[in-house]
A protein has these predicted regions:
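Secretory targeting and sorting signals
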Residues: 1-26
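Alpha-helix boundary/capping residues
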Residues: 13, 81-82, 141-144
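A generic structural signal for short, solvent-exposed coil/turn residues
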Residues: 17, 35-39, 51-53, 67, ...
């Protein structure tokens, strides 16, 4: 009887030892060579009704490039806002109280990819909150102050 218990225990231990590496092998992470590199940040900035800086500009960050007139400064500003924990493309909250003032007819739209996520943001200068939001995005958006 003792011999039978020892044989069963030995067989069970051997079966368990053989099964554990097989189960663990399927959960191993992928080799680093198979992981993709982070995507370059690519934005299209379209500006209208500014009287002097209307147009469509391409802005690439990481590395800096495109035809944006202040590409390096714009990328630095976006990085600065991200380090502060701010979403530079977030709209003004609907429940936000804003001063009733008109900052001008200028409008802008930014589309593309930033930090791996899609961007589709519009900017205007139709009230105090939107004016502040525009200024926060300078030099990504042009300086409209004289």
């Amino acid at each position: 009887m003792l011999r039978r218990i020892v044989l069963i225990a030995t067989a069970s231990a051997a079966a368990l030892a053989a099964a554990v590496p097989a189960a663990g092998a399927s959960s191993l992470p992928l080799p680093l060579a198979l992981l993709s590199a982070p995507a370059e940040d690519e934005l299209t900035v379209t500006v209208s009704d500014t009287a002097r800086t209307d147009g469509m500009y391409e802005l690439r960050c990481g590395p800096t490039g495109g035809d944006h007139p202040a590409a390096q400064d714009a990328c630095d500003r976006l990085d600065e806002l991200a380090l502060e924990g701010k979403d530079p493309f977030a709209p003004v909250r609907q429940d936000q109280m804003c001063t009733e003032q008109m900052g001008g007819d200028e409008t802008a739209r930014i589309t593309g990819t930033w930090q791996g996520r899609p961007v589709d943001a519009t900017f205007s200068r139709t009230n105090g909150c939107e004016i502040s939001r525009w200024h926060t995005m300078e030099p990504v958006l042009p300086n409209t102050r004289s």
